[in-house]
């Protein structure tokens, strides 16, 4: 399986994402810069955290118009796994690949610590490696992770089981304690916590690795079935 890590000006978690795939998952991975226009040959797309374009205007608002984004949207429409973490989640929201928006954290402070999450839906291509209702600990690092949507959208997210991860503690004021959601099809996931920073027991936590092993397992199963 071949992964693309999209690199925007100001991305600072691209190397972590690359390491998680190459060394944690043992799969092929390449950096793809924002100036590129094609993702041909890649099986999954990863949008890492950071401060793309300095987070000017809004987080992800400028990156959304990068030359690579039409290819990201095309990959999502083709059913390929697309994962946006932290700033990557914000870019997916700005691009309309996921519903809702991000606001400043409710206390107006940057939060950088390991938090407790609950796996709300383990039937997605990103979460099948977890148990339903499992509690996990994953690092966060953001100033604008306060997820917002209208009540109708929130009800729809719940009804369609699009909420994959939920905070199990106060973190940023996110509506419904949402930490990660998918699109209706289930192949695009945006999450504020950083699973790529929790893939090695050597560093004290490997509970994020299952996000990536889930993607790989789903891809292998679908390709074996297809063949």
Swiss-Prot record:
Any one GO BP annotation for this protein: 'de novo' IMP biosynthetic process
Catalyzed reaction equations: N(2)-formyl-N(1)-(5-phospho-beta-D-ribosyl)glycinamide + L-glutamine + ATP + H2O = 2-formamido-N(1)-(5-O-phospho-beta-D-ribosyl)acetamidine + L-glutamate + ADP + phosphate + H(+); L-glutamine + H2O = L-glutamate + NH4(+)
SMART domains in the record: GATase_5
Compartment(s) where it occurs, according to its Swiss-Prot or TrEMBL record: Cytoplasm
An MF annotation (GO) of this entry: phosphoribosylformylglycinamidine synthase activity
GO cellular component: cytoplasm
Pathway: Purine metabolism; IMP biosynthesis via de novo pathway; 5-amino-1-(5-phospho-D-ribosyl)imidazole from N(2)-formyl-N(1)-(5-phospho-D-ribosyl)glycinamide: step 1/2
InterPro entries reported in the protein's UniProt record: Class_I_gatase-like, PRibForGlyAmidine_synth_PurQ
Catalytic residue list: 86 (nucleophile), 194, 196
Disulfide bridges in this chain: none
EC number: 6.3.5.3, 3.5.1.2
Main location, first listed in the record: cytoplasm
Cross-referenced PROSITE patterns: GATASE_TYPE_1
Alphabetic keyword roster: ATP-binding, Cytoplasm, Glutamine amidotransferase, Hydrolase, Ligase, Nucleotide-binding, Purine biosynthesis
Residues annotated as domain Glutamine amidotransferase type-1: 3-227
Oligomeric and partner information: Part of the FGAM synthase complex composed of 1 PurL, 1 PurQ and 2 PurS subunits.
Function: Part of the phosphoribosylformylglycinamidine synthase complex involved in the purines biosynthetic pathway. Catalyzes the ATP-dependent conversion of formylglycinamide ribonucleotide (FGAR) and glutamine to yield formylglycinamidine ribonucleotide (FGAM) and glutamate. The FGAM synthase complex is composed of three subunits. PurQ produces an ammonia molecule by converting glutamine to glutamate. PurL transfers the ammonia molecule to FGAR to form FGAM in an ATP-dependent manner.
UniProt name for this protein: Phosphoribosylformylglycinamidine synthase subunit PurQ
This protein's encoding gene: purQ
């Amino acid at each position: 399986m071949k992964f693309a890590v999209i690199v925007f000006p100001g991305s600072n978690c691209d190397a972590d994402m690359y390491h998680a795939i190459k060394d944690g998952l043992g799969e092929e991975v390449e950096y793809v810069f924002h100036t590129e226009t094609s993702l041909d040959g890649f099986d999954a797309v990863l949008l890492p955290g950071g401060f793309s374009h300095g987070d000017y205007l809004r987080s992800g608002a400028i990156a959304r118009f990068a030359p690579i984004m039409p290819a990201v949207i095309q990959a999502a429409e083709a059913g390929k796994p697309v994962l946006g973490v932290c700033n990557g989640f914000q870019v997916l929201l700005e691009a309309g690949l996921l519903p809702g928006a991000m606001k400043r954290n409710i206390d107006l402070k940057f939060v950088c610590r390991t938090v407790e999450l609950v796996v709300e839906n383990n039937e997605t291509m990103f979460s099948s490696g977890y148990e339903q209702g499992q509690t996990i600990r994953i690092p966060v690092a953001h100033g604008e992770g306060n997820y917002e949507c209208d009540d109708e959208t929130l009800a729809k997210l719940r009804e369609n089981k699009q909420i994959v991860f939920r905070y199990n503690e106060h973190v940023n004021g996110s509506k419904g304690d949402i930490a990660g959601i998918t699109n209706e099809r289930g192949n695009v996931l945006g999450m504020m916590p950083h699973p790529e920073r929790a893939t090695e027991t050597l560093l004290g936590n490997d509970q994020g690795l299952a996000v990536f092993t889930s993607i790989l397992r789903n891809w292998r199963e679908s390709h074996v079935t297809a063949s």
